[in-house]
């Protein structure tokens, strides 16, 4: 049996299949020990899965909180400050108070090695045995268990990195992150930062995965990567940097599958959980970037282009020094959680939805978890006094602010990139998104929104259906006309990729099923950026056309060069199954008063499981599932389609 498990900041979600039906479970996360929630969930399910595909936030949270492990960074002499200086690019050009990202590497843990290669990979200054001994002595003195090695031009010739790695691994037990293995590409700052982040996080992830592996000794555990595919646990222990968007990637992958199932050209996914919201614009295929900024630092490996904002059900409402009401980015998380959980006293978005009548206390988590509306109201009263509004006005203000924060995130991936969102659907999933989708759809003038039946566990569904993906790249710096050399580099990288995957412990049977996709990074000679295109005939013409589409112009008579060759090995995804479990969460429909911007209104409350394909219902409605609620305003039409997936359309004037 196969299980997809997504560990979020507030809840841990499970998806598995029995007798042809998808089943789900949601349990509170245990941030101090994420494995505990996984084991509790599996115990409740009562199964010992053969395969577990895990979306994890262990490495992500460790970096955001700067709780990784101290490591030694080895660089070429004279380049010790590269990681500290960074790039001069300013995220906000006119901001006079730009803050540099919080450092994660200690300056005293950086050592420069007296060696040098040319840009062509030729040895200018050999790495001497004396230098190697000096490095070994330095690492031993620091007591580090993790080491990052990023030498100048090692992407062209890794000879010195390999020599250092051999000496280090022979003399002591270390986790080694070598830049020519982590990111075999030009640009020393990006390569160094990516390698250093990996060294900082891998010990944390390795300990966590080993503990999980020990508890699940009869289960093959795989870890979801930021590129939407999973990798074996043996590789994940050494490649923590590849898991920074582990959970959200599962949601984006499932979003693409659902869009294809219903024949929809474009969707913007909205994954609103308890801690944050992840958005991703999908048009026919997953969007990838290799310029991802991870809390101020570049991670230049291929990741799904997902934008995250600190707006979730657990986002705390607070008042700043000027008396303005704010929401997030700090979250109450799973413990103590929103005030209504009975442990904390902070008023959150979940508390606001509860007070406004959008969440029904008796149905929270299918009635499995008791909530305390009176605690929400007590926290709201204190907040309202600070703001100077009535409690209900304050609760509405909290919802309006968090919606505005999410609209800003949605515009970040659409209008700010020159894309008109009005032809797109919002794909709303995550436990909280259904309560906010109507307002977001209206604010962005979208076609409508889609709410899958497994909305609250949708990312776990993406993990359940995931396949293995392995990305490899190499800088080649060749003119686009040099077709023979380009072809040779492609074939060499393919061969190396298969050898590397075999070394990860992947079975030959699985390797034989992998399909190779080849991409090239191209640019006009002298440019400082590239466009990634599939390997094809007439590369120059294809690049001119892509450049015109991206930037509005092209230089047809200007030389084009291939910077990087990329090979992606992919497996076959599990087919998307929309048949949900027959064990229904039902109740007799009733009416309930819900407070809206226009005042109190009567909403009909109906169980999601009582709907059937073809049903069309007009709001105002609360459609309640075991783990989520859909808030349908009166100017929206809800239509039920395959798998009890609900399409909601706004009335057009």
Task: Name these PLM-found stretches.
Residues 34-35, 41-45, 180, 184, ...:
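ATP-dependent carbohydrate kinase catalytic cores
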Residues 14, 25-30, 72-78, 98-100, ...:
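Glycine-rich phosphate-binding loop of actin/hexokinase-like ATP-binding domains
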Residues 15-18, 23-26, 50-89, 148-161, ...:
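Short beta-strand-loop/turn "lid" adjacent to the catalytic site in phosphate-handling enzymes
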Residues 150-195, 199, 566-585, 647-652:
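Terminal amphipathic helices with adjacent charged low-complexity linkers/tails
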């Amino acid at each position: 049996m196969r299980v997809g498990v997504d560990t979020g900041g507030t809840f841990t979600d499970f998806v598995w299949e029995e007798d042809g039906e998808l089943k789900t479970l949601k349990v509170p996360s245990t941030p101090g020990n994420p494995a505990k929630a996984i084991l509790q969930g599996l115990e409740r399910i009562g199964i010992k899965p053969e395969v577990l595909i895990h979306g994890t936030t262990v490495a992500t949270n460790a970096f955001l909180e700067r709780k990784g492990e101290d490591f030694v960074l080895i660089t070429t002499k004279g380049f010790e400050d590269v990681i500290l200086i960074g790039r001069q690019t300013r995220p906000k050009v006119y901001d006079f108070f730009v803050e540099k990202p919080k450092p994660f590497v200690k300056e005293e843990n950086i050592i420069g090695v007296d060696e040098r290669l040319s840009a062509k990979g030729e040895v200018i200054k050999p790495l001497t045995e004396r230098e190697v001994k000096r490095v070994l002595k330095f690492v031993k003195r620091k007591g580090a268990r993790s080491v990052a090695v990023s030498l100048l031009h090692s992407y062209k010739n890794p000879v010195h990195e390999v020599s250092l790695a051999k000496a280090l691994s022979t003399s002591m037990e270390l986790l080694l992150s070598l830049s020519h293995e982590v990111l075999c590409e030009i640009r020393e700052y990006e390569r160094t930062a990516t390698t250093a982040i990996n060294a900082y996080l891998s010990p944390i992830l390795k300990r966590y995965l080993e503990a999980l592996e020990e508890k699940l000794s009869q289960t093959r555990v795989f870890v979801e990567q930021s590129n939407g595919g999973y990798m074996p646990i043996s590789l994940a222990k050494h490649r923590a940097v590849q898991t920074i968007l582990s959970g959200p990637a599962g949601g984006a992958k499932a979003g693409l599958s659902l869009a294809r199932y219903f024949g929809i050209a474009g969707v913007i996914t909205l994954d609103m959980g308890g801690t944050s919201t992840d958005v991703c614009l999908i048009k026919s295929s997953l969007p990838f970037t290799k310029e991802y900024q991870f809390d101020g630092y570049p991670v230049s490996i291929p990741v799904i282009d997902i934008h995250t904002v600190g707006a979730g059900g657990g986002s705390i409402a607070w008042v700043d020094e000027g008396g303005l009401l704010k929401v997030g980015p700090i979250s109450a998380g799973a413990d103590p959680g929103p005030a209504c959980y009975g442990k904390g006293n902070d008023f959150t978005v979940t508390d606001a939805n509860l007070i406004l009548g959008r969440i029904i206390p008796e149905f929270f988590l299918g009635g499995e978890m008791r909530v305390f509306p009176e605690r929400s109201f007590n926290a709201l009263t204190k907040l309202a006094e600070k703001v100077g509004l009535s409690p209900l006005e304050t609760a509405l203000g909290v919802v309006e602010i968090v919606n505005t924060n999410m609209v800003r995130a949605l515009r970040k991936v659409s209008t700010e990139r020159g894309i008109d969102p009005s032809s797109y659907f919002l794909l709303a999933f995550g436990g909280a998104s259904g309560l906010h989708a109507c307002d977001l759809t209206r604010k962005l003038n979208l076609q409508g929104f889609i709410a899958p039946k497994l909305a609250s566990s949708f990312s776990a569904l993406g993990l359940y259906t995931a396949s293995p993906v392995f990305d490899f790249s190499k800088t080649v710096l060749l003119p686009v006309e040099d077709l023979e050399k380009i072809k040779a580099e492609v074939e060499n990288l393919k061969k190396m990729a298969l050898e590397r995957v075999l070394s990860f412990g992947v079975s030959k049977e699985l390797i034989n099923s992998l399909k190779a996709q080849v991409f090239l990074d191209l640019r006009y000679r002298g440019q400082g950026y590239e466009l990634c295109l599939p390997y094809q005939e007439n590369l120059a013409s294809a690049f001119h056309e892509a450049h015109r589409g991206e930037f509005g112009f092209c230089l047809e008579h200007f030389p084009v060069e291939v910077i990087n060759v990329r090979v992606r090995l992919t497996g076959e995804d599990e087919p998307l199954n929309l048949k949900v479990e027959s064990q229904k969460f039902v109740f007799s429909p009733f009416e309930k008063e819900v407070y809206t911007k226009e005042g109190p209104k009567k909403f009909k409350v109906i169980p999601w499981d009582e709907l059937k394909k073809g049903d069309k219902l007009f709001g105002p409605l609360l459609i309640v599932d075991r783990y989520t609620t859909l808030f349908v305003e009166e100017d929206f039409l809800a239509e039920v389609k395959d798998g009890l997936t609900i399409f909601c359309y706004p009335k057009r004037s």
